[in-house]
Design a protein with these regions (language model features):
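A conserved ligand/cofactor-binding region detector
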Residues: 1-313
Length: 313
């Protein structure tokens, strides 16, 4: 499993504020550490949406296999690596065995028990990759923490690939006032499509990482528009149904003040912040009346059951 890093869109305002969008693929086991950086706008492929057979096949073909076998010692860091060749061979064999067992159990839960992929795929996550789109005006803290030798080795690997590209790659494109940072919108589309349509297409294409990996398929403005409208949900109806608006955070236009904030961006007006009602209010009483809490009540009634009884058997 390779850690893949691409810069999809890189822009800098005339005031000097830089906005960069990365497309990433990395081991699922380090995703929680990426998620701790709240200045990031991100969308990621969800194991709730990927068919079980596809997840199992990806693990069979290309499972996550640690590239650094750190020896046990006190604390969070492992400074010494397992170097004995027989030991490394045994560790890889045991890890591969665990992946095969989990794949078999996941398949049985799906085929024999008829369970949904949102549950079954959880078993496969330690061996899977995840595709992520990240946009931010502030990467310095991420690099300072995750490029440091104290960071977990595999997130160091990701962070250094990102830092190398960020600092030594091509220079960002200068965007003037009223010009837009639009990931996945081609130069030809910038010439041929109205600006509002370009925004819609960019939003939908950023969102699709949640449903499928970008595979080079020809984009469709019609399908992009359909997905965009689904993401907005009930915002235009005022019925309290939440929108799914995180894909609207990757598009932005420069602010005159390079230090002014908009959402989690600095120096750029974030598209999401221009959408009326983008922060959906929560009506507790109405949610209860609609039955939104039914699942939580069901699980509350079951959480005192002792699963260890089954495990010990």
């Amino acid at each position: 499993m390779k850690t893949e890093v691409k810069i999809i869109e890189d822009s800098i305002s005339e005031a000097g504020a830089r906005l960069t969008t990365f497309q990433l693929a990395y081991p699922r086991v380090i995703h929680a550490e990426v998620m701790t950086h709240r200045v990031f706008s991100r969308n990621a492929s969800s194991s709730r949406a990927i068919p079980v057979a596809k997840m199992v096949a990806s693990i069979a073909d290309d499972p996550f296999m640690p590239m650094y076998w750190g020896l046990n010692e006190p604390g969070m860091q492992s400074r010494k690596e397992l170097t004995d060749q027989m030991g490394v061979k045994a560790a890889k064999a045991l890890w591969s065995h665990a992946a095969r067992v989990c794949a078999r159990v996941a398949t049985d839960l799906y085929e024999l028990c008829g369970l949904h992929k949102q549950l079954v795929n959880r078993i496969l996550e330690p061996f899977s990759s995840i595709s992520v789109i990240v946009s931010s005006t502030s990467y310095e803290n991420f690099f300072a923490l995750r490029c440091h030798p104290d960071a977990e080795p595999h997130i160091q690997h990701l962070a250094w690939k990102m830092a190398d590209l960020y600092y030594t790659g091509p220079q960002p494109t200068v965007r003037k006032a009223d010009e837009w940072h639009l990931p996945y919108v081609s130069a030809a589309e910038r010439e041929s499509l109205p600006l509002e349509t370009q925004k819609v297409c960019s939003v939908a294409r950023c969102a699709r990482v949640s449903y499928r990996t970008h595979d080079g398929a020809s984009p469709s403005v019609e399908k992009d528009t359909e997905l965009y409208n689904r993401l907005l949900g009930g915002l235009d109806k005022g019925d309290g149904e939440p929108g799914h608006l995180s894909p609207l955070e990757h598009q932005a236009t420069p602010l005159a003040d390079g230090k002014a904030a908009s959402g989690n961006f600095v120096g750029w007006q974030q598209f999401r912040q221009t959408i009326p009602g983008q922060a959906t209010p929560f009506d507790y009483a109405k949610a209860v009346a609609r039955g939104w809490r039914d699942m939580a009540d069901l699980l509350s009634a079951r959480e005192d059951e002792d699963p260890s009884v089954l495990v010990r058997r």
